[in-house]
């Protein structure tokens, strides 16, 4: 009986620690264009990321207004386990494979038709106020991408 109670407590603690770790990303983040670098440019007019818990892990929703003023939306749901998940609304990818590195960092590989296009590293600052996304690879136009996007928590 004691072993069973300890096992139940262990599962509860693991579940709670996963939820707390995911909380580092949870919230709404707005692009700070002044602190960001887009190569190739230009930077989007606006980009908002929203991370929220979901029954299947962590849900990312994004709203973009590109440099020409065209609006789009997209996102994915992941367990941050490195497995491919559908990525809607991204011209550079149809799947993503986000994987947790630590409580403040995850890496992501974007693929289009099974071919790697862009790799990303997403880091929440120690104070939880800034999210930095570094991207390298090749976009859907065949251009080399080397972006650093900085977001402020709302």
List each model region and its residues.
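Positively charged n-region of N-terminal signal peptides that target proteins for export
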Residues: 1-5
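Bacterial N-terminal signal peptides
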Residues: 7-16
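Hydrophobic small-molecule pocket/channel-lining residues, especially in calycin-type beta-barrels
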Residues: 20-154
